[in-house]
Structure formats: C-alpha cells, structure tokens
A protein has these predicted regions:
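Generic serine detector
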Residues: 34, 48, 69, 76-78, ...
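Short, well-structured alpha-helical interface segments that form or flank functional binding sites
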Residues: 42, 76, 107, 111
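Structural preference for beta-strand elements that scaffold enzyme active sites
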Residues: 28, 78-80, 129-131
C-alpha cells in the first residue's frame, strides 16, 4: 500500500498511451473499491482513483499488461481499477447500502467512467467486457446472496445523475459509453 500524496497523479494522455500500448491484449476491465481510506493506493490494481478524481498507478508505473491480483481467477488479460475509500461500508440489501465514512464521490465516479472509456476506446475493449467486482463475483458464485464469507459487493449500487441508487455497473458503463465519443 502506498499513499497517494507520495505518488504522481496521472494525466489522461498517459492513460491513453498505456491503453494504446495494450491494444488487443486486454479481455476485461474489473471495477473495484479499496475498502480502505481515501488516499491509499494498492498494488493489486492497475489504477486507483482518489476522492478528488485524481488517478494513480502503484509505484508511478502504469503498465496495463502487468499481472495484478485484483479479481479472483480473472486476473490474466484484465485491468483492475479501484476507487479509494468505502472504509467500513455495509452492503445491507444493495440499494440501501451504507458506503461508510468515505463513500464514492461524484469526482471518483466520473473519473472511473472516463478511464473506462479511454481503455475501451484505445485498448480495443468492448464496453460489454467491463464489470464491477460485484457483477463478476455474482457470476462466479461469491457475490451478494451467495453466503460466501468473502462476498464481494464492490460497486453493487451507485447514485446516478439523479441521485437514485442504480446498479453500479450500469451507471459506470453508461457514463463510459457517453465519454467514449469525447476522449
């Protein structure tokens, strides 16, 4: 774990170049949260997005082809992106989840959608191959309702532009689709 204050924020051109360098080699993008405090960047993720929307790579080394351990059994050929925060979050029933003392911020949600748009556009990844950790965990049998003690529910629901809670993957893919024409 590193502190964002000790890392250099990435600009979107750096992310575009990393995506170009990985063109045709990425199968999936998985979206997470760190379940820790803002400002903490973990090496399991290729990119981390802090509360203010600034984007960081662990060790200031952005390589989207590097193998990182972010999603059980699905790390090869994939990119992991995490929002910092959601420390002490509680799933409850999904729409009524409590994001804890450090919830996803609007700046983080928009930055994540922009990063997804860049990776999809420049690395040649289909928007249909972008999943939240909750979505892929549900497919693989360790998502909400599975009874698994290691249940993953990252980004199960998020507030949309109208502040209504909606499935997080739908929110993020919808925003990313809009940004793809603008990045």
């Amino acid at each position: 774990m590193e502190y964002a204050e000790n890392l250099k924020p990435l600009d979107l051109e750096e992310i575009k170049q990393a995506a170009r360098d990985a063109h045709g080699c990425i199968d999936n993008v998985f979206l997470h949260w760190s379940a820790d405090r803002y400002g903490r960047v973990y090496g399991e993720y290729h990119l981390s997005i802090d509360y203010d929307g600034r984007i960081y790579a662990p060790d200031n080394d952005l390589d989207l082809l590097e193998h990182r351990s972010h999603t059980w059994l699905r790390n090869s050929g994939s990119v992991g992106i995490a929002l910092t925060g959601c420390y002490d979050a509680e799933a409850n029933g999904g729409k009524d989840c409590e994001f804890g003392s450090q919830p996803p911020t609007p700046a983080q949600i928009e930055a994540m959608a922009i990063v997804v748009a860049i990776i999809c556009k420049y690395a040649g990844v289909s928007i249909r191959d972008v999943y939240t950790h909750c979505e892929i965990a549900s497919i693989d049998g360790y998502g909400p309702g599975s009874g698994d003690p290691e249940t993953k529910w990252d980004l199960w629901y998020l507030p949309d532009f109208d502040d209504q809670m909606k499935p997080g993957g739908e929110v993020l893919r919808g925003k990313a689709q809009w940004y793809m024409e603008r990045v």
